[in-house]
Amino acid sequence: GDGMMEFNSSFYFSIFIFLLTYAGIMSERIPRSLCALLGAGLVVYSGLVTQEMALRHFIDFNTIGLLAGMMILIGVVKKSGFFEAMALWSVRISKGRPKELLIILGLITGFCASFMDAVTAVLLITPMTISLCRRIHVTPIPTLIAEILLSNIGGSGTMVGDPPNVMIGSATHLVFNDFAMNTGPIALLNVAACIIYLEIIYGKELPKTEMTEEELGKISISSVITDYSILKKSVTILALTILGFIVHNIIGIESATIALTGGVLAILACSVDPHEIFRDVDWDSLFFFIGLFIVVGGLETTGVISALAQAGISAVGGDPEALTFTILWLSGIASAFIDNIPFTATMIPLIHNMQELLGLAHADYMWWALSIGACYGGNGTIIGASPNVIVAALAAKEGYNITFGHFMLKCFPMMLVTLLTSTIYLYVRYFLFGTP
């Protein structure tokens, strides 16, 4: 009857808006935040969702708040010269040897990406990497590629690292410690695999030079620290914030509140100008998330997501194991070619739906498969994840071109290796020894 027709038109219209938004994001002609906000506007104007529904049900403000809070907090830490000091320290430790420097800077990036947004990590570390590599007369491209790979792997290990994890943690009952215990071990394993891999692909082509004792002596770490009191206070508050994440489910306070409190306390304690800090927040990303949540909300309301969930189950069968590995590899391959943030935003309600249909409310391994796939898939191509795009843009500005082909040649095999190790990990941990 009439109702059916109506269902069909809005059903297809929500898909149309979604694909339009996606095409805009992938064309890179229009900033992705604007694509998402225009898509969100269409969803509301076309009557698929009301503004109230969009604001109340679809935008995950915990994700937005957590990212904003961490951006503010890291903005304060940045003012102390902490990150420049870390960069100089890594030159000293590596004695200026290109291969050791690549590994140390890569590990620092991976470590930073695990407790702050990976984008922020590479924004801080990329410019320093380029200047350090110039100092030791070697092309920064291998080191930058190492940093991209390790930022995506490091970010997958905790709930506050990569955006897919932030979103999954926010949309489910999973908390900080769940991520540390489940995606953490495989991240560590893959960091090791990545370093061996980098050794294989770049070991030969990096020169064997090193700095003289005299040159190393000239590197003064204390000279780059602009303010010791800001350094002490802001790093202490950062540590307390991370502690807050670890106990957030015990104290019953959501992670966004903890991050925003940390940010505000850091601004107050270090008496820095809030205008300056707020100006440096990556608003583009935050608005991208807001718009995206509404566009995906359109797909949810019109029943597209549940239709996809049913199609997925009938294609793969209701076997939890087969579904889990399908989620892992689908997420991995898809996230290599499309941004892993919109992909995850679409997959979250899809997995919720599948779990309901199959009565698998506690099948957390499906979330781990999504998280691992989306994070590691980001390593497949230069457009696979936000950090990649940012590193490439910053490098191009300095005259170093990381081409799509070069990156894919070096990194796609690494992505496949990490997905293989993850397949074995998920199988052994949740199906062989676990009780699915």
Regions found by a protein language model. Give the residues of each.
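Interfacial loop-to-helix junctions that mark the boundaries of transmembrane helices
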Residues: 3-10, 52-63, 176-186, 226-230, ...
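Structural signature of hydrophobic alpha-helical transmembrane segments
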Residues: 6-16, 60-72, 114-122, 186-188, ...
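Juxtamembrane and boundary regions of transmembrane helices in multi-pass small-molecule transporters
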Residues: 7, 135-141, 157-160, 177-225, ...
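Hydrophobic alpha-helical transmembrane segments
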Residues: 12-16, 33-38, 65, 99-107, ...
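Flexible hinge motifs at transmembrane-helix junctions and intramembrane kinks/re-entrant loops
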Residues: 19-38, 228, 232, 240-260, ...
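Transmembrane alpha-helix interface/packing and boundary motifs in multi-pass membrane proteins
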Residues: 20-30, 108-117, 148-160, 247-250, ...
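Membrane-embedded alpha-helical segments and adjacent helix-loop junctions characteristic
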Residues: 52-141, 283-358
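Re-entrant/interfacial helical elements at transmembrane boundaries that shape
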Residues: 120-131, 144-145, 158-172, 306-311, ...
